[in-house]
Structures are given as structure tokens and as C-alpha cells.
């Protein structure tokens, strides 16, 4: 490869989804030290939904944004401290500027894959301040390669130095990765990245496929710690980069040690694939919906897989969590109606 691959470790951001955003200061400090030793280029830290997202709607974090960022920054020397900012959750004055005061080195500004225009204010402002800024296209499986080129092109125009495709639902196949990443690499003048989820068991091969297609940024988490079925594990991505002799700063043994540190401290349950996470990948539904879907399933007595498939049919995206309850109630009502019909027929 002509450009050295950058590794963005999202363990302390995406991983927060897996523990209902309850990572503590000591956990953050310990893992930040391990990630620094492993040689990750960027350590992304924060609430699972990014800056300013701690709320009743999507989960209240155990630690404030500022406390998380300061705890991580104190342990970093060569790795950059990164944050996720989603307009609507994060605002410039309340969230972004205080985060920069905490030592944030780069910001990734995210939006749904067809709504890049909402990132304009934040990307242009950050770029004018001299901050490294990248764009994220969420739920990118939902858009064609052509649409992604158009939307990523807007982010490039606003000043983003890179655009990362987020497989928020774990719905990508290697062929989809080749097509979409390859198209962006060919058509844009900035770096392209890929953020995998493992709902279909393809996070590692999709990450390596992205690199082969020209991506120069890959996201990872320790033990795949993240929303739903988890992400591409840092230890497995590092191992595959080593085997394939792909150049990167990350150090294999230290990456393995970082994953061990995470499991010892806070990865209580290593992400696995089950009926719910697999259905989420098939339906193309945001991985972070797994836990609320399970809760709604128990509350209303309906199959969580049916909830996910209906959410997929409705093309529901992150931020529309209220729809989960609506769908569960509708399915429960349909089931009750069917039961009454059967009971009536049986008595005729």
C-alpha cells in the first residue's frame, strides 16, 4: 500500500453501547494506556452516540464527556484523542468547544448516509479552527455507491480530510465493501475508511476487504466490544494485517495485550452472534437497537426477530428508538387479534 493504514480504536466509544454507557474513569484510563502501547493512531472516546448524547432517550452515561476525555488524554502520547459528533446530539458551544479544551485532537462528524448536509456547520467550523476533522456516513448500507460518492463529496467540500463508511447495522457483505469503498476511493480526493459490525460474522473480512479496495482507515474495538454483535476485534484485525504484511503503526502483541486488558476490566460478555443480532444484520437495522428490542420483546411478548424485520421494512434509523415500542405494540395487537379469530373459528 502507498499510504500507511490508520487504525481508529473505538473501544471506549462504540464499546460504551455494550455496557449501557457505563464505562468508568478507571476503565478508560487503563484501556487508554493499553491502546497507546498498541500503537493505535486514534483512540475514540465518549458516550456510544457521541458528544452530548447522554440522555434518557439513548442512555445516561456514568461519566461526563469531559471526565472521559480528560481521563483518556492523560494516558496518550503518540495516539490521538478522537470524538464522535452527531449534529442534533452535539452542539458547537455546549459540546464541541469544551471537548477541544479537554485535549481532543480530531473530531469525526457523523450523519445518516443521505444527510451529509447537516454536517456542514461543524466540519467547516472545526476546519477553520485547524482541528483534524473527518466525516462519517452512518447506516451506509442503505445508500447506493453513487449516492455515497455524492454525500461524501459534500463532506470533502466542507473540509473533511477523510470520510468513513459506517456499517451501523452489520449488513455489509465483502462484495458491497469492494463496490462502495472502491467507488469512493476512485472518485474522491481524500482518505476513505470503514467501520465494521459483526452481525453477519463478516467484520474482519469486511475490514480487510476495505483495505484491499483502497481504504486507509479501519475502525476496531477490543474483543469486538460494541453495539449489537460488536465490531471488528482489534486483536484479529492486527493479526490479519500482520499475516498479510499490511503496513500500520499498530503492534501485534501489544494489540493482543490491549484486548486482554479490556476483557479483564470491563468486557463482561464478549459480543457473539445470536438470533437477534443476526436478524438485525439481515434487516439492516442499527446494531444499537439490540438491547431495546429485547426489552420490548419481553414487555409485549413478541418475537424480537419480528420486531427487527419490521423495523427494517420501515427503514428505521438511529434516533428513532420510540418506533421499537410502536412496532412491538402493533405486533402484539396483531397476535392478539389472530388468537381471537382462531378462538372464534374453533367455536363455530
UniProtKB/Swiss-Prot annotation:
Residues reported in the UniProt entry to bind substrate: 13-14, 168, 195
Top-level enzyme category: lyase
GO BP: any one term: L-leucine biosynthetic process
GO molecular function, one term: 2-isopropylmalate synthase activity
Site entry (Transition state stabilizer), positions: 13
Active site: residue positions: 17
Catalytic activity: (S)-4-hydroxy-2-oxopentanoate = acetaldehyde + pyruvate
Domain Pyruvate carboxyltransferase stretches: 5-256
Keyword entries, A-Z: Aromatic hydrocarbons catabolism, Lyase, Manganese, Metal-binding
CDD domains reported for this sequence: DRE_TIM_HOA
NCBIfam families associated with the record: 4OH_2_O_val_ald, PRK08195.1
UniProt-recorded name of the protein: 4-hydroxy-2-oxovalerate aldolase 2
Amino acid at each position: 500500500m502507498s499510504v500507511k493504514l490508520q487504525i481508529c480504536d473505538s473501544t471506549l466509544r462504540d464499546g460504551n453501547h455494550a455496557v449501557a454507557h457505563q464505562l468508568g474513569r478507571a476503565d478508560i484510563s487503563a484501556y487508554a494506556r493499553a491502546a497507546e502501547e498498541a500503537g493505535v493512531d486514534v483512540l475514540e472516546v465518549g458516550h456510544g452516540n457521541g458528544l452530548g448524547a447522554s440522555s434518557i432517550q439513548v442512555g445516561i452515561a456514568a461519566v461526563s464527556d469531559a471526565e472521559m476525555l480528560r481521563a483518556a488524554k492523560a494516558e496518550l502520547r503518540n495516539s490521538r484523542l478522537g470524538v464522535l459528533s452527531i449534529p442534533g446530539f452535539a452542539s458547537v458551544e455546549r459540546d464541541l468547544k469544551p471537548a477541544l479544551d479537554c485535549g481532543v485532537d480530531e473530531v469525526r462528524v457523523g450523519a445518516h448516509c443521505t444527510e451529509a448536509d447537516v454536517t456542514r456547520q461543524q466540519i467547516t467550523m472545526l476546519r477553520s479552527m485547524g482541528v483534524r476533522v473527518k466525516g462519517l456516513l452512518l447506516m451506509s448500507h442503505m445508500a447506493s455507491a453513487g449516492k455515497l460518492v455524492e454525500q461524501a463529496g459534500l463532506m470533502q467540500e466542507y473540509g473533511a480530510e477523510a470520510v468513513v463508511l459506517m456499517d451501523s447495522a452489520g449488513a455489509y457483505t465483502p462484495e458491497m465493501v469492494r463496490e462502495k469503498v472502491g467507488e469512493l476511493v476512485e472518485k474522491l480526493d481524500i482518505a476513505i475508511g470503514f467501520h465494521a459490525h459483526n452481525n453477519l460474522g463478516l467484520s474482519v473480512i469486511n475490514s480487510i476487504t476495505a483495505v484491499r479496495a483502497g481504504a486507509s482507515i479501519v475502525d476496531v474495538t477490543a474483543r469486538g466490544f460494541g453495539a449489537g454483535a460488536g465490531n471488528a476485534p482489534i486483536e484479529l484485525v492486527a493479526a490479519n494485517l500482520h499475516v498479510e504484511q499490511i503496513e500500520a503503526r499498530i503492534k501485534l502483541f501489544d494489540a493482543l495485550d490491549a484486548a486482554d486488558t479490556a476483557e479483564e476490566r470491563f468486557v463482561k460478555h464478549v459480543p457473539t452472534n445470536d438470533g437477534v443480532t443476526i436478524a438485525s444484520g439481515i434487516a439492516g437495522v442499527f446494531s444499537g437497537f439490540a438491547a431495546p428490542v429485547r426489552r420490548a420483546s419481553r414487555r409485549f411478548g413478541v418475537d424480537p426477530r419480528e420486531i427487527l424485520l419490521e423495523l427494517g421494512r420501515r427503514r428505521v434509523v438511529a434516533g428513532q428508538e420510540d418506533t421499537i415500542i410502536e412496532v412491538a405494540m402493533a405486533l402484539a395487537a396483531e397476535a392478539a387479534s389472530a388468537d381471537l379469530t382462531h378462538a372464534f373459528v374453533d367455536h363455530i
